[in-house]
């Protein structure tokens, strides 16, 4: 299986490191793409970061790395089956799935004016299923605010982070933080696809806000 602590070795059949070279990443497919279910974008890129090493190092040395591109729903299922399950990962590990060549950084142009919906969850048996459902909703266009062409790329990606002490957070990154109607529509879609109870509070914070919530749902 792919995953921490050997995320780098797991994708050794394709280059890692500089995301600008993303086009050379291995495409996760064994079948005929023409006979499989196309995604709502040209491709999505799966990123990963292993458990934080005990020694202190530079922030960049512990950055997420691109692992694989996926172009069809079937390719997603194959890759998902090969990765370590979220429930087995150690503290500090992160999985991210982002649209096309968008990088999971605040500085990426697609993220610069955006923010993130944070979804608190318990580290429980259904974590693996919740992560899979969130990813499938993202790549299938089920999280977008509307069917309008202008909204199709509003959702930039989704993430899973395991924090110290067992805290867990799912996230959905969006493009336009000032469009409140769109952000609230995304939140409602998140609730629907994850079957979240009303008492689960979602918070939306701009990437540069140091965690201060702009919207809640």
Language-model segment annotations:
Residues 8-16, 25-36, 41-43, 52-62, ...:
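Conserved NAD+-utilizing ADP-ribose enzyme module
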Residues 1-2, 119:
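Intrinsic structural disorder
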Residues 71-74, 126:
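A generic structural signal for alpha-helix starts
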Residues 64-69:
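A short, exposed loop/beta-hairpin motif centered on an aromatic-Gly-Thr core
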Residues 74-86:
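Short active-site loop/helix that positions an aromatic residue
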Residues 48-50:
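Residue-level signal for short segments within beta-strands and strand-turn junctions
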């Amino acid at each position: 299986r792919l995953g921490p602590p050997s995320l780098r070795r797991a994708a050794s059949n394709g280059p890692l490191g500089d995301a600008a070279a993303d086009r050379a990443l291995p495409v996760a497919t064994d079948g005929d793409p023409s006979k499989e279910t196309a995604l709502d974008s040209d491709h999505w890129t799966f990123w990963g970061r292993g458990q934080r090493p005990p020694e202190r190092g530079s922030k960049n040395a512990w950055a997420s790395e691109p692992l694989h591109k996926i172009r069809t729903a079937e390719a997603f299922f194959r890759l998902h089956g090969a990765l370590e399950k979220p429930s087995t990962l150690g503290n500090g590990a992160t999985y991210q799935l982002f649209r096309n060549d968008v990088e999971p950084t605040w500085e990426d142009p697609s993220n610069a004016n955006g923010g993130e919906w944070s979804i608190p969850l318990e580290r429980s048996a259904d974590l693996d299923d919740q992560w899979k459902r969130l990813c499938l909703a993202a790549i299938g266009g089920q999280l977008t605010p509307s069917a309008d062409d202008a909204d199709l790329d509003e959702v930039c990606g989704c993430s899973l982070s395991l924090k110290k002490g067992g805290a867990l957070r799912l996230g959905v990154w969006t493009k336009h933080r000032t469009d409140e109607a769109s952000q609230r529509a995304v939140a409602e879609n998140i609730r629907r696809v994850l079957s979240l109870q009303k008492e689960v509070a979602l918070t939306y914070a701009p990437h540069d806000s140091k965690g201060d919530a702009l919207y809640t749902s």
